[in-house]
Amino acid sequence: MIGPPVNLPKWLEENSHLLKPPINNYCVYNGDFTVMIVGGPNARTDYHINTTPEWFYQHRGAMTLKIVDPTEGNNTFRDIVIREGDMFLLPANTPHNPVRFADTVGIVLEQKRPAGSLDRMRWYCQREGCGAVVKEAAFHCTDLGTQIKEAVEAFKADEEGRRCKQCGEVAEWCPKPGSIRDPNLE
């Protein structure tokens, strides 16, 4: 059965309590496409790698999409600010960390994963000048609402598994307060 349209402001008024850390997402549609409403703030340091493109629309406030850009050679870390009213299409297989700030809301649309495809959650060393891969988890994504959260929670619980094999730094499981510039304060 085809359901009715979702009035986003009304949905947020009635359901914003469903947007819970560490991901703060809620899947409103989950079929051939997954449509998530995502609120802020969130607390994660992972970079998600999806074999399909992801579409972002920022309904309220601005967010920062931290990416590892393979097109600039040597996997350059960079930030893309998506402001209120902006939409952005992230190419498939681009490592990305969506950073959401207080009182912000966005919509993310993802395709259903092809059979046999693996999503990856990757954590990089945060020490200046290092950037080595600290840990990577792979899974066939069938439920975005729970699987990403499970991977983040497992990383949080494994302090020794967060140690960089290249420099010895222990990676943070969530960003340190004030470590990421909030474009909403500019």
UniProtKB/Swiss-Prot annotation:
Catalyzes the oxidative ring opening of 3-hydroxyanthranilate to 2-amino-3-carboxymuconate semialdehyde, which spontaneously cyclizes to quinolinate. Pfam families: 3-HAO. InterPro entries: 3hydroanth_dOase, RmlC-like_jellyroll, RmlC_Cupin_sf. Its EC number is 1.13.11.6. Belongs to the 3-HAO family. GO terms for cellular component: cytoplasm. It comes from the Eukaryota. It catalyses: 3-hydroxyanthranilate + O2 = (2Z,4Z)-2-amino-3-carboxymuconate 6-semialdehyde. This is 3-hydroxyanthranilate 3,4-dioxygenase. A divalent metal cation binds at residues 125, 130, 164, 167. It is found in: Cytoplasm. O2 binds at residue 44. Its cofactor is Fe(2+). The gene is BNA1. One of its GO terms (molecular function) is 3-hydroxyanthranilate 3,4-dioxygenase activity. It is an enzyme of class 1 (oxidoreductase). Keywords: Cytoplasm, Dioxygenase, Iron, Metal-binding, Oxidoreductase, Pyridine nucleotide biosynthesis. Gene3D superfamilies: Jelly Rolls (2.60.120.10).
